[in-house]
A protein has these predicted regions:
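Catalytic Walker B motif of ABC-type/P-loop ATPase nucleotide-binding domains
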Residues: 169-173
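Short, charged/small-residue-rich alpha-helical element at the C-terminal edge
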Residues: 239-313, 321
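Helix-to-loop junction immediately C-terminal to a conserved catalytic motif
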Residues: 63
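ABC transporter nucleotide-binding domain
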Residues: 186-274
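Conserved ABC transporter NBD signature motif
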Residues: 71-79, 86-87
Length: 321
């Protein structure tokens, strides 16, 4: 997965999102201190960081809802500070929580959203039908939005973000409240939208799901984007792999016999986590186990790449710079 952190925000790139040296404070609190990155068209870019790292403030600036104190932002080559009215039709913004106009039906809410972009009533009615089918709210189309569950309101919020067929999507925790099937459907939809050439920037605390959909990643901590060097160093650090065997307790001695010091997984008496320096090291351990007759039933990283990299950045001791 590519990292698109500080130092990669120039080069005359017009399409997608380009952010350079952006800062934003609220009084004495610096929410975003120094953010630079590029989000490319045609791929999903993950926005990753702990609580309080500045993700939501950054998304609000990209959505033209906050002005940066310093730095520059370009959405499809347009400055959202100087030309917000030109940028907004290009954007689809899905916040973590958004009011759903409780007394309107799902259909009416989508029709009104579409009409706000200047479309005719017939065009908005047709677009609402498309959006309802796209997010799977057909059975609820003529029900008031107040009866929707949390997950159903998320689907409605996504549909509203897509109302004007945007080139750039900004999604803050889009899978929150969705059931497992709906999460899979969301992942497939995002990949399809990216495949159509859209720029998608998505923030989520569920890193395993981001791993499955994101091609690039932006890492934030205390309002600062991680440098390419910091991300590379974090990825180069050792990684835990989970190993299981059909041979039960024989796995421990087998690992020790090839020079590996296993740490038993408390919740699984037959499994171990093993620290590997890289994939070549992991491949060598697996080959040695199989050659020694161990019947390996599971051999995989204990965490996804995003989680591993974020942990490596947090454990570097000097911040993420």
């Amino acid at each position: 997965m590519g990292a698109v952190g500080a130092g990669e925000g120039g080069g005359g790139v017009a399409a997608g999102i380009v952010v350079e040296g952006v800062r934003r404070s609220f009084g004495s609190v610096a929410a975003v201190r120094d953010v630079s990155f590029v989000a490319r068209p045609g791929v999903v870019t993950a926005l990753v960081g702990p609580n309080g790292s500045g993700k939501t403030t950054l998304l609000l600036m990209l959505a033209t809802l906050l002005r940066p104190d310093a730095g520059s932002i370009r959405i499809e080559g347009i400055d959202p500070v100087a030309q917000p009215a030109a940028v907004r039709p290009l954007l689809g913004w899905m916040p973590d929580a958004l009011g759903s106009w409780a007394n309107l039906t799902v259909r009416s809410a989508l029709e009104i959203t579409h009409r706000l972009y200047g479309h005719s009533r017939p065009a908005s009615a047709a677009r609402a039908v498309e959006l309802i089918a796209l997010v799977g709210l057909g059975e609820l189309a003529d029900r008031p939005t107040r009866v929707l569950s949390r997950g159903q309101k998320q689907k409605l919020s996504l549909a509203r973000a897509l109302a004007n067929d945007p080139r750039v999507l900004l999604l803050d925790e889009p899978a929150s409240g969705l059931d497992p099937v709906a999460r899979i459907e969301l992942r497939e939809l995002l990949l399809r939208l990216a495949g159509e050439g859209r720029t998608i920037l998505i923030s989520s605390h569920v890193l395993s799901e981001l791993d499955e959909v994101a091609t690039d990643a932006v890492y934030l901590d205390h309002g600062v984007t991680a440098s390419q060097e910091a991300v590379a160093a974090a990825r180069a650090s050792s990684r835990l792999w989970r190993v299981k065997s059909l041979d039960g307790f024989a796995l421990g001695p087998a690992l020790e016999g090839i020079g590996v010091d296993p740490v038993r997984i408390a919740s699984d008496s037959q499994g171990f986590t093993v620290s590997m320096t890289d994939e070549a090291d992991a491949a060598a351990v697996l080959a040695a186990l199989v050659a020694g007759g161990t019947r390996v039933s599971w051999f995989a990283p204990a965490s996804g790449e995003l989680e591993r990299t974020l942990q490596g950045l947090a454990g570097s001791g000097g911040g993420i710079r």
